Amino acid sequence: MEELKVEMEEETVTFTGSVAASSSVGSSSSPRPMEGLNETGPPPFLTKTYEMVEDPATDTVVSWSNGRNSFVVWDSHKFSTTLLPRYFKHSNFSSFIRQLNTYGFRKIDPDRWEFANEGFLAGQKHLLKNIKRRRNMGLQNVNQQGSGMSCVEVGQYGFDGEVERLKRDHGVLVAEVVRLRQQQHSSKSQVAAMEQRLLVTEKRQQQMMTFLAKALNNPNFVQQFAVMSKEKKSLFGLDVGRKRRLTSTPSLGTMEENLLHDQEFDRMKDDMEMLFAAAIDDEANNSMPTKEEQCLEAMNVMMRDGNLEAALDVKVEDLVGSPLDWDSQDLHDMVDQMGFLGSEP
C-alpha cells in the first residue's frame, strides 16, 4: 500500500511540474490569435467560377486562355444550359456577366467571351481573396462610359457590331443598285437616240432615192436644170461646181468670187426645189400609173432586197460635182440610153 501511494505522489508531482513549466512559458509571451482566423474567404461566386474553369471536363465549354491569365466561354449556349444550372442554380448568361462586372472582370476580346481579372489566374486560387465586390456600380458604369474605359457589356454582346456591319453592307448594296439603275437608264437613252438617228438616216436615204428617181424620170426637169446652169455660167462667168485651189494669201478678188460662188449655189438649189415641186404637182394630177411610179416601185423592191447598195456605190462628192459640168447634149444622151426612165411617147 505504501508503494502505491508513493507512485501516485510522484505522478502528482510530475503533473504539477509540467503545469508549472507551461505556466512559466505562457507568462513569458502574450497570447496571439491564429493567422487568418478573422479573414474571410473568397466569395462563393468566384470560388465556383474558378472551379468551373479549372475543371478539365468543361474545357470544351469554358477554359483558361493560352496565357492562363483569363478564361474563355467557348459555347455560351451550352454554358447557360449545362454549367450555370450545375454551379449557380440558374441559366441566365446575362446575370453571370453582371456578376463578373461587379467583381471587376473586363472583356479582353470583342469577338469572343473572354474575361480577365488580376486576381483570377490559373493555379493561384489563393488570389481570389484579393478580388473585392464593387459598390455603386451604376455610378461607376457612368464614369467609365464618360472616360472611354472598356467594361463588360451586358446582354447580347457582339450582335450590335454585327448589326452595324450589316447596315453598312446594306448601304453599299443600295448605292450599287442605284448606280446600276442610273447606268441602265443612260444606256436606254443612248440606245433610243441611236435608233432615232438610224431611222432619220434611213428616211433621208429613202427620200434621196425617191428624188433621184423622179428627177431622172422627168426629162423636162433635167433639160431645164441644164439650161439654167448654162445660162448662169454664161451670165456670171463662173465655172460652178469645180473645185478651186486655195492660195496661201487670197486676194480680195478671190474672196468676192467665192462669195458669188456660194450665192450662185444657193440660187441653183432654190431653182431645183421649185422645179422638183412643179414636177410633183404635174404627176399628182395624173391618175394613171407612170413609168416614174414603176421606177419607184422597183427601187423600193431593190431597197428591201438589199441590192440597191451595190448599185449605188458612188461617192457623194462625185454626185455633187458632176451634174453641174454636164452639157445639155450629155443629159439628152444619158436620158436616151436610160429608155425605161424616159417620158411617155
Curated annotation (Swiss-Prot):
A GO term, aspect molecular function: transcription cis-regulatory region binding
Region described as Hydrophobic repeat HR-A/B: 150-216
Disulfide bridge positions per record: none
Post-translational modification remark: Exhibits temperature-dependent phosphorylation.
Position of sequence motif Nuclear localization signal: 231-238
Main location: cytoplasm
Family: Belongs to the HSF family. Class A subfamily.
Description of how the protein assembles with itself and partners: Homotrimer. Interacts with SUMO1. Binds to HSBP.
Name of protein: Heat stress transcription factor A-2
Naturally occurring in which organism (per UniProt): Arabidopsis thaliana
